[in-house]
Structures are given as C-alpha cells and as structure tokens.
C-alpha cells in the first residue's frame, strides 16, 4: 500500500508500503517477495490475489532499469495521459503486469478479487491487469509513446513493440466493488 497507509500489523499477513503513483525500490522488493512465494506452485495450488487501484505503482518488477521506469512514469504523469494510456505503456515494461503475474503462478489456479477504480471496470487496466489477459496492443502502446513524445531507451522501445498475454486459462476473476457501485451508494445516501 502507499506510504502511511499501514495502520498496524495483521497477524500472518506481511504488509509493504511503497511508492505511488511512481514505483520505487520498495515496490520492486515487495513484488520480488510475491514472486518468490508463487515459485514452484503446482496445478493443485490456488493463489488468492486481492487487487485494487494503485497496484500499477505498488506491484512492479520492471523489465527496464528501475530509474528508467520511474522516468517514463513521470513523463506519462506530466503529459496528461489518461489511466488507460498509462497502463498500456506500463504493461509492456513490466514482468508482472498485463497477465504476466498469472503466468508466474501457473500451473496454479489464480482466484483474483478486484476492487475497480476505473470507470467501466476494464479488468486489464485495473492495476495494469497482472492476472488477466491484456486487451491492449503493441500498436496502441507505440501510438501512445508517439502521441506524448516519450523519451525511451532502445530497450523500452523494443518492449513496447512486443505483445502481452492475450489468453490465460488459470485465472478466475471477480469484481467485488467498482466506481459505479460507489456512485450508486453515494446517490442512495444523498436521497436519504
């Protein structure tokens, strides 16, 4: 979670604070811990994956140097890119986004419980979709990089040109809350 949001210890649960909206060394370390936990799982195992908005920065294993990923994230934030554009780029620069975390868990089943913070609940965009197939394309990522004239290394540019997983057969996803539900509850409270 973001710095300052852990309100105490939870027995049996490791809590990590990290950078948001820009990932930092704690983001990378916490993600490495999660990846260590899912190594060697079998088809008999099930991963319960709880996911909410903010995960794009908090859950990260970059495929480019960490400082470069931070720079690209800052460029996107300064450019005015929307969350879908930002996450389309982020997915291609990460070893866990765009369905790749689910691949790390395979052959185990992944049961993903999602709290959506994006209108329309596009599963592949919530926290950059670490446990769902990616609906965005490399063509879209390249167009976004061009639109915002992102300064990218050759390595980052090559990653944007690569596709992400488009199918995952080991994942079940359930949205437990969304912006739409929040707005409906707020409207109901106002009517009372």
Describe the residue ranges of each PLM region.
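N-terminal loops that bind phosphate or other acidic moieties
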Residues: 1-192
């Amino acid at each position: 979670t973001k710095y300052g949001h852990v309100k105490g210890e939870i027995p049996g649960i490791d809590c990590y604070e990290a950078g948001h909206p820009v990932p930092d060394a704690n983001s990378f370390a916490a993600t490495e811990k999660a990846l260590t936990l899912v190594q060697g799982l079998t088809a008999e195992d099930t991963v319960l994956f709880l996911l909410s908005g903010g995960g794009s920065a908090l859950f990260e294993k970059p495929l480019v140097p960490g400082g470069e990923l931070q720079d690209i994230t800052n460029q996107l934030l300064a450019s005015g890119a929307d969350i879908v554009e930002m996450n389309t780029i982020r997915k291609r620069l990460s070893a866990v986004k765009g369905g790749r975390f689910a691949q790390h868990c395979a052959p185990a089943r992944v049961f993903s419980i999602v709290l959506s913070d994006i209108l329309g609940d596009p599963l592949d965009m919530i926290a950059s979709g670490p446990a769902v197939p990616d609906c965005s394309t490399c063509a879209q990522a390249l167009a976004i990089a061009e639109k915002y004239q992102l300064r990218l290394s050759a390595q980052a540019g090559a990653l944007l040109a690569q596709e992400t997983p488009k199918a995952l057969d080991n994942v079940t996803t359930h949205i437990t809350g969304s912006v739409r539900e929040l707005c409906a509850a707020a409207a109901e409270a106002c009517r009372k």
